[in-house]
Amino acid sequence: MNITILGAGAWGTALAMSLADRHSVMLWGRDAAVMQEAEQRRENTVYLPGFRLPDSLSLSSDFSAAIAHVGTDGLLLVATSLAGLRPLAMQLQPYAIPNIVWLCKGFEADTHLLPHQIVREVLGNDIPAGALSGPSFAQEVAQGLPCALAIASDNAALRELVVSAVHGPSMRIYSTDDVIGVEVGGAVKNILAIATGIIDGLKLGMNARAALITRGLVEITRFGVALGGRTETFMGLAGMGDLILTCTGDLSRNRKVGLGLAQGKKLEQIVTELGHVAEGVRCAQAVRSLAAERGIDMPITNAVAAVLFDGDLPREMVGRLLARDARNEMA
């Protein structure tokens, strides 16, 4: 199968490596210099250093060539950041693409839209579209370590296409039609990972970490169901699975934000050290606003947003959460 991946960051590169042994894969990146160096060195030294790119993997900075590679029956995967999704979708408007599947997570900063809403707004409703999400660190995928993801789409044929293309020896793909649930799970877990990083950075113990992750799952579910997702989706890979990985994994950028905040660092310093803004930072403001508009109780999200944007100290965040009134666990 012909597969084009738009976005040569760590995740796009890792997925391209995983698929190149059994498909004709082209990885497109916007920066011609980065792609030329990757072609010459057979290594993406900027975004995924230390991993040799398969000889069978094609690299390009030519957008038209990358889209042409998909053909009429291939698969188009978008591995940009959420901030890059709308500009890329607009760039796709002149082309006849057979489908589109995105890997980004979050809510758009200005509009508070989910990825599927952005794609539909720009490209319309006729193109088969879906979200590929779940617990996945790029470095582990590049190593060929086991991984499981979920493809969410309201188009059954696209779900089958993605499963047949991406499912492989070290990667299992499950399918669902709950696009909203999968996208909300992938977005809100980043906020909770910041909170978990704060808990760990303050050395409050594993009991506190477990409590926060568990109550965080309740919070994700409450929010996601209010937006139209299904409860069971949040018990799966894009909910509980992604939440556990992002909150506990040492490779988690969002957890690193929380650790830095607990150490007294300013957000600007943390972002500089990371090299880019972690999605949870962008997402916290959007989710706080959406929850307030809809009257959804989001105590952990609100506490994280207060630390990020309102000047609250990390210990104040913890104190505020512990001071909440007792309640039924499922409330």
Curated annotation (Swiss-Prot):
Example of a GO MF term: NAD binding
Catalysed reaction, written as an equation: sn-glycerol 3-phosphate + NAD(+) = dihydroxyacetone phosphate + NADH + H(+); sn-glycerol 3-phosphate + NADP(+) = dihydroxyacetone phosphate + NADPH + H(+)
Pfam families assigned to the protein according to its UniProt record, in alphabetical order: NAD_Gly3P_dh_C, NAD_Gly3P_dh_N
Residues the entry annotates as binding sn-glycerol 3-phosphate: 105, 134, 136, 189, 242, 252-254
Top enzyme category: oxidoreductase
Name of the protein in question: Glycerol-3-phosphate dehydrogenase [NAD(P)+]
EC numbers for this chain: 1.1.1.94
Domain of life: Bacteria
Organism: Herminiimonas arsenicoxydans
Catalytic-site annotation from UniProt: 189 (proton acceptor)
Family the UniProt entry places it in: Belongs to the NAD-dependent glycerol-3-phosphate dehydrogenase family.
Localization (cell): Cytoplasm
Binding site for NADPH: 11, 30, 105, 138, 253, 277, 279
GO biological process, one term: phospholipid biosynthetic process
Keyword Cytoplasm: yes
Pathway stated in the Swiss-Prot or TrEMBL entry: Membrane lipid metabolism; glycerophospholipid metabolism
Principal subcellular localization: cytoplasm
GO CC, one annotated term: cytosol
Keywords associated with the record: Cytoplasm, Lipid biosynthesis, Lipid metabolism, NAD, NADP, Nucleotide-binding, Oxidoreductase, Phospholipid biosynthesis, Phospholipid metabolism
